[in-house]
């Protein structure tokens, strides 16, 4: 708990002086004011996060965190649980969607096991921070103990901080866990106050009957566990997952170290809800990479006040949408740092300037 507390205490407000200076620079670059739209706003936000008016976000890191879920016993996913570990090995070999997109944007992929049912220790560059061999079935009792929930969040903090010596200019969240949209929907329902049906989607492709069953399982989990919406660790422990907790830790650690953090889809969004519940100020450091096709994602983004950068109908997870969004944030920072001012370029300004 000390690691978590210290991390939260380090998260300060955005650097308003840097943001004002960044806005002034944006207005003096060789373009009509506001002509680069959200790229200008992103550049200013990056300055608020980093405290630097001119900065580059070249060292990009995607944190893909994996775990299994006891609630998968209820049949809420089309895929068997062994796919979680199989996909981790696919990540390690560089053959997954996130690996391809990361190569395209020049990002490193860090893969972490915090709770799969298999032994992944010693496999290539996979990092093992295993808390347990999968969560328990939240439909019949708590997914984990409160101590395990804290351990999950702290594991995410430790994972990001372990990468700092290699350099992390910007980070993105990613997930892997068969059945993990089920706890994500439960978390979203509890922390946004929305009905289960409004925040629950088809996940890996459930039909109507499967979706109805999934909603029923979530309602049963909420009735059995009665998670306290005022206590994010209680919510995580009762209806969450180990990778969701660890992703919340990655988000908190990024903010504590003044690193822009790009949030992926629905599962990462559930982690963002937990992180904001633990430290409301962390919200200012988060950038929504995209809007997932999962219906609960739009609900939680609205609750967090985040406007997604992309809307491509994606619902893969793994950090794929965040990876693409990360390239836009890096481009925004580069524009602000490298584009010439009117004076530098010897270009006349608009007459009303």
Curated annotation (Swiss-Prot):
Q: Does the keyword Calcium apply?
A: no
Which Gene Ontology molecular function entries are recorded, alphabetically?
nicotinate-nucleotide-dimethylbenzimidazole phosphoribosyltransferase activity
The active site of this protein is located at: 318
Q: Which CDD domains match?
A: DMB-PRT_CobT
Listed Gene3D superfamilies? 1.10.1610.10, 3.40.50.10210
Q: Which GO terms describe its biological process?
A: cobalamin biosynthetic process
Alphabetized UniProt keyword annotations: Cobalamin biosynthesis, Glycosyltransferase, Transferase
Listed under catalytic activity are:
5,6-dimethylbenzimidazole + nicotinate beta-D-ribonucleotide = alpha-ribazole 5'-phosphate + nicotinate + H(+)
Q: Which InterPro entries match?
A: Nict_dMeBzImd_PRibTrfase, Nict_dMeBzImd_PRibTrfase_bact, Nict_dMeBzImd_PRibTrfase_N, Nict_dMeBzImd_PRibTrfase_sf
Q: In which pathway does it act?
A: Nucleoside biosynthesis; alpha-ribazole biosynthesis; alpha-ribazole from 5,6-dimethylbenzimidazole: step 1/2
The UniProt record lists the EC number as 2.4.2.21
Q: Does the keyword Transit peptide apply?
A: no
Classification via Pfam families: DBI_PRT (PF02277)
Q: What does this protein do?
A: Catalyzes the synthesis of alpha-ribazole-5'-phosphate from nicotinate mononucleotide (NAMN) and 5,6-dimethylbenzimidazole (DMB).
Q: Its family?
A: Belongs to the CobT family.
Cite the HAMAP family for this sequence.
CobT
Task: Write down what this protein is called.
Answer: Nicotinate-nucleotide--dimethylbenzimidazole phosphoribosyltransferase
Q: Which gene encodes it?
A: cobT
